[in-house]
């Protein structure tokens, strides 16, 4: 298979092969080597003492000292990879190479969903993980053929009463309303926390269709994995009640 059709990605500093391996396959593989600043086995040591030949493109993540003990955790690499993806994607949007997801989309014959998103103050800001609310918003937008994001930053300063949400959703012509809230609190003296996703589904007349809560335990790393698991559960619940929800894993980063 031509190397243009696939990319091989390695995490950490794996022993790819010796000089003979590199000569045989080096120009046949589109290789991306991802390492981090706290990797216990630097590639240079493998090169000098192990006889391994490093090739391909090298990307190094500068990880927070707070998670240096998790430097070989694949969940850590997933957290950082999503963060790096957003940085690269935003640059591409600025350069006009890519287009950001629209905050409203209409597909003929598909019910319009008014989407409301809430990020609780208790959700700690961690500099070494991506914007969880952005990830969740984009995943929800990928679930609905027709949607309009009514507010992606619900908080105490922009409080809407239930009747306000109903009225505003009716004004845009929505048939259904989905309210998604995320929260995360870390108990004192604990090295883990829980990422919580609340999801409420209503008809535009205000009647309740479904309301559920999902929670996943998160350590120093694993935020994206926990978010993805919550999203998969939330999507399964949506599909029980809204048959037009996309059945394809179009956007789920957790689907790896």
Label the predicted regions.
Residues 2-112:
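Serine hydrolase/lipase
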Residues 9-13, 180-181, 199:
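Short His-Asn-centered micro-motif
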Residues 13-17, 37-42, 47, 120-123, ...:
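Solvent-exposed loop/turn segments at secondary-structure junctions
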Residues 16, 35, 123-134, 159, ...:
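Soluble non-cytosolic domains of exported or imported proteins
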Residues 103-111, 134, 142-144, 171, ...:
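C-terminal/domain-edge helix-coil "capping" segments
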Residues 112-178, 208-211, 241-248, 254:
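N-terminal segment of the mature soluble domain
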Residues 181-185, 202-204:
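Beta-hairpin (beta-strand-turn-beta-strand) motif
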Residues 192-197:
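Short, surface-exposed coil-to-beta transition loops
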């Amino acid at each position: 298979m031509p190397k243009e059709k696939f990319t091989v990605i390695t995490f950490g500093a794996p022993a790819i092969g010796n000089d003979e391996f590199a000569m045989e396959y080096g120009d046949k593989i589109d290789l991306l080597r991802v390492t981090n600043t706290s990797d216990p086995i630097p590639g240079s040591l493998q090169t000098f003492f192990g006889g391994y030949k490093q090739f391909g493109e090298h990307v190094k993540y500068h990880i927070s000292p707070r998670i240096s003990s998790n430097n070989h955790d694949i969940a850590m690499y997933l957290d950082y990879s999503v963060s790096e993806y957003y940085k690269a994607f935003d640059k591409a949007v600025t350069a006009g190479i890519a287009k950001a997801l629209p905050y409203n989309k209409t597909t003929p014959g598909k019910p319009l969903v008014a989407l409301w998103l809430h990020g609780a103050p208790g959700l700690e800001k961690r500099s070494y993980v991506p914007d969880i609310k952005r990830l969740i918003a984009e995943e929800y937008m990928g679930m609905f053929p027709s949607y309009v994001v009514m507010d992606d930053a619900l908080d105490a300063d922009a409080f809407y009463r239930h009747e306000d949400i109903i009225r505003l959703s009716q004004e845009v012509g929505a048939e259904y309303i989905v309210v998604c809230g995320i929260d995360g609190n870390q108990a004192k003296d604990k090295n883990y926390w829980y990422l919580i996703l609340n999801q409420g589904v209503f008809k535009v007349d205000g009647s309740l269709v479904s309301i559920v809560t999902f929670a996943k335990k998160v350590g120093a790393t694993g935020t994206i994995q926990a978010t993805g698991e919550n999203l998969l559960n939330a999507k399964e619940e949506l599909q029980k009640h809204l048959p037009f929800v996309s059945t394809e894993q179009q956007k789920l980063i957790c689907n790896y």
